[in-house]
């Protein structure tokens, strides 16, 4: 079973308070999501392998460490996942960015893939799937399916807010995928919204309704 990591860092929790607040406007909401994604990236990349290299400082030669050539891919789920990309790229500018687009079938209510564009070397790359909200878990699970069908083997899921129901779905369908969240909320309501949640992340990021 994949592990669930919930980040309790004070800076993250402080910023999530204002992400949740309905009075936070589009500009501030967008900046806060960017900042939280960047802070979460510190933890989600903690297991990146390192290697020793020789350098010369202004004082002497030294043996120090760099990331050992790991290929990373960020996969935002359209459209809300886009709001998390830049915050991570600030720390990992060499990461490649793909996209997965899904819509919900009005009859079956199941997510349907309509767009997938991935970086090269899929089988050799570590992927981080990005979505601010993990509600029912259907979209995240299907996005992970899309990656696996194309050869991806190392996948993590990163969300800002998650419902227990969504976590359970992803863990059951993808027991090999670890989930990283900034907040684990109480539940889903009868309409499938996370409670207390933060509303519709896509609408709040892009100023739409």
From Swiss-Prot:
A single cellular component GO annotation: cytoplasm
CDD domains linked to this entry: PRTases_typeI
Regulation of protein activity: Allosterically activated by GTP.
Ligase among keywords: no
Free-text cofactor note: Binds 1 Mg(2+) ion per subunit. The magnesium is bound as Mg-PRPP.
Pathway assigned to this chain's UniProt record: Pyrimidine metabolism; UMP biosynthesis via salvage pathway; UMP from uracil: step 1/1
Top enzyme category: transferase
Gene Ontology BP term (one): uracil salvage
Record's keyword terms, sorted: Allosteric enzyme, Glycosyltransferase, GTP-binding, Magnesium, Nucleotide-binding, Transferase
Enzyme Commission designation: 2.4.2.9
Transmembrane segments: none
Recorded GO MF terms: GTP binding; magnesium ion binding; uracil phosphoribosyltransferase activity
Residues binding uracil, per UniProt: 194, 199-201
Cofactor(s) listed: Mg(2+)
Keyword Translocase: no
Residues that hold 5-phospho-alpha-D-ribose 1-diphosphate according to the record: 79, 104, 131-139, 200
Coiled coil: none
Catalytic activity as recorded in UniProt: UMP + diphosphate = 5-phospho-alpha-D-ribose 1-diphosphate + uracil
Known function: Catalyzes the conversion of uracil and 5-phospho-alpha-D-ribose 1-diphosphate (PRPP) to UMP and diphosphate.
The family this protein is said to belong to: Belongs to the UPRTase family.
Xref: PANTHER family: ADENINE PHOSPHORIBOSYLTRANSFERASE, URACIL PHOSPHORIBOSYLTRANSFERASE, CHLOROPLASTIC
Protein name: Uracil phosphoribosyltransferase
């Amino acid at each position: 079973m994949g592990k669930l990591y919930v980040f309790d860092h004070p800076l993250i929790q402080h910023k999530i308070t204002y992400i949740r607040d309905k009075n936070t406007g589009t500009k501030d909401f967008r900046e806060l999501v960017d900042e939280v994604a960047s802070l979460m990236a510190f933890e989600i990349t903690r297991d990146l392998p390192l290697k020793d290299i020789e350098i010369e400082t202004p004082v002497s030669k030294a043996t120090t460490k760099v990331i050992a050539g790991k290929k990373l891919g960020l996969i935002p789920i359209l459209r809300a996942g886009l709001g998390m990309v830049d915050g991570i790229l600030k720390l990992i500018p060499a990461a490649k960015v793909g996209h997965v687009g899904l819509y919900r079938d009005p009859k079956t209510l199941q997510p349907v893939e309509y767009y997938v564009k991935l970086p090269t070397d899929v089988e050799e790359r570590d992927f981080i799937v990005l979505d601010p909200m993990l509600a029912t878990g259907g979209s995240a699970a299907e996005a992970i399916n899309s990656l696996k069908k194309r050869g991806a083997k190392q996948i993590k899921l990163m969300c800002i807010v998650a419902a227990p129901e969504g976590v359970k779905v992803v863990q059951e369908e993808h027991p090999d995928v670890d989930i990283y969240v900034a907040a684990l909320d109480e539940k889903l309501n009868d309409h499938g919204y996370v409670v207390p949640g933060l509303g519709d992340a896509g609408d709040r990021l892009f100023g739409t309704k």
